[in-house]
Amino acid sequence: MSTKIAFFDIDGTLTSEVDGSLPDSAILAIRQARANGNLMFINTGRCYQNVEPRFMEIGFDGIVCGCGTNIYYGGKELMHVHQPHEVVMEILEQVRKVDADVVFESREEVLFDLSRGIRNPAAKKLYEEFKSLHYDMSHPLEAEDYTCDKFVVWYDTCLLYTSDAADDLT
């Protein structure tokens, strides 16, 4: 029998998009597939620090995280790709030019551009979620040592952002 490999996303695949629950049936199926000699991986857009321990406790063989920027197998890091500071600064400059919201993510931290406040409702919701989890988001984006693994930009041409209207979006 040949070994097969399966990849599972977290959000909306392993867990319910409604309440984040993880069904026992999924845990049992993954463990049975491993017992049958197959490799089980998480493949998520989340960076490593955002993968909750409950997922790793299932017994996955490895994880591809950060949209492919970080790969672990057998408890060892095989690959990590990050964007250098100069690239982060170029992205930040372009995002600010179009007046969009951005979050930069890495294995260690999550940083939002707070220079103009967060206006997009989805970005604001994510910021509040990370804040409630007590993430340290205080590292200055412009610091010369700052790099990131990936970034997300929110730009909605349907929303007219003003400082007064942004408060009404929540």
Task: Give the positions of each predicted feature.
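Asp-based phosphoryl-transfer active-site loop
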Residues: K4-E17
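Short, solvent-exposed loop/turn segments at secondary-structure boundaries
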Residues: V18-L22, K76-M79
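Hydrophobic, aromatic-enriched interface-forming segments
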Residues: P140-L160
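A general structural motif
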Residues: M1-T3, G37, D99, C148
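Single conserved hydrophobic/aromatic residue that forms the stacking wall/gate
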Residues: Y161-T170
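Active-site phosphate-binding/coordination module
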Residues: I27-A122
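Acidic, His- and aromatic-enriched active-site or binding-groove loops in soluble protein domains
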Residues: N120-M137
